[in-house]
């Protein structure tokens, strides 16, 4: 992945190989094309997992893998569940209008930057409030098509860029993408 792509995903490790979903899909397409040309079956193991994305199977990468896997003589193997006991993912149900649910993220001393995705199934819409470890509250941000809202927390010195995308192009769902910089340790609440 390029530096710009890594920055957009709030990834500051540049000393390890990283790939965009598009690079992985191009590699998959190439391998399958060569197998077809040689008239051979093919099994492709693609061990490139991600915490990002809707995880519904409706994204472009997932749909492409499903389409390739449906072809005779083609098997695509991907890893799943590698972080099942690490509280990396969460989900919840908001029963009715006005209900409030908290997503709590415990940030450690060494965690300085963090990308956060909150997915909302279509056609539902939500407002987002953020509570810092010191109790500072940013109230009821909401989608206005696609926007970037820059937030600065006074006591923590943390900066967040909140982007609402509705509908997100590959799934049709709503995506709230938060890029958090200079995080302070403690429990951050997203409600």
Q: What spans do the regions from the language model cover?
A:
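Substrate-binding/specificity loop regions of serine endopeptidase catalytic domains
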Residues: 49-191
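Short acidic, glycine-rich surface-loop motifs adjacent to enzyme active sites
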Residues: 8-10, 26-56, 79-80
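Subtilisin-like serine protease catalytic core
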Residues: 1-22, 39-40, 57, 71-73, ...
């Amino acid at each position: 992945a390029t530096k710009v792509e890594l920055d957009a995903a709030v990834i500051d490790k540049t000393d390890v190989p990283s790939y965009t979903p598009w690079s992985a899909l191009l590699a998959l397409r190439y391998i399958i094309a060569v197998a077809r040309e040689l008239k051979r079956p093919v099994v492709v193991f693609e061990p490139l997992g991600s915490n990002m994305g809707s995880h519904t199977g409706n994204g472009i990468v997932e749909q492409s893998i499903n389409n390739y896997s449906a072809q005779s003589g083609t098997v695509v193997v991907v890893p799943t569940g590698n972080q099942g006991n690490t509280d990396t993912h969460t989900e919840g149900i908001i029963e009715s209008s006005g209900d409030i649910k908290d997503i709590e993220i415990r940030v450690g001393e060494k965690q300085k930057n963090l990308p956060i995705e909150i997915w909302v199934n279509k056609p539902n819409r939500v407002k987002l409030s953020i509570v810092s470890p010191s109790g500072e509250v940013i109230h009821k941000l909401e989608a206005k098509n696609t926007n970037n809202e820059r937030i600065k927390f006074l006591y923590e010195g943390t900066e967040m860029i909140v982007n609402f995308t509705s509908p997100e192009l590959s799934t049709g769902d709503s995506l709230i993408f938060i890029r958090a910089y200079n995080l302070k340790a403690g429990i951050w609440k997203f409600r």
